[in-house]
Amino acid sequence: MKNEKIKTNSGITIIEIVIGITLFVIIAGITIVSFNPAGQFARARNSEREMHLTALMIAVKQNIAESISGSFNCVSGPIPVSSAKMASASGSYNIAPCLVPNYISVLPYDPKAAGAHYAGVSDYDTGYFIAQTSSTTSTAITISAPSAELGQIISISR
């Protein structure tokens, strides 16, 4: 008997390549949709806003604690009773000279609010708002982040 060699083709066909690419695209699409990067970034920015508001509140409370009168000591006057933007522009509450550098090194600003920035005590816009409410029994200071994302309301009162 003769040894006959059977010839076999051992290559990858175009159909196998197309199936492999299709599976890769489907899995990648499902992964990207399930992670929702835009939502993850929005949640991260909201967490950053919460940290900013906490830092600002701590600085304000330290100012009050060190004040002889027990109230907020600021060249801009008392904290407004109606919500006011913390910024250096006219019509805003200029809080930076009262906090920087004694109570906080730099003012934090909203990561996505239009125009929010900090270039120094005389040029800033935090994108955050502050108000003080008083009753016969207590005084509360509220700092809020109106540019919060995902429908979340971010504010801190103490």
Where are the model-predicted features located?
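N-terminal signal-anchor/signal peptide hydrophobic helix marking the start
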Residues: 12-22
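Membrane-proximal amphipathic alpha-helices
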Residues: 42-53
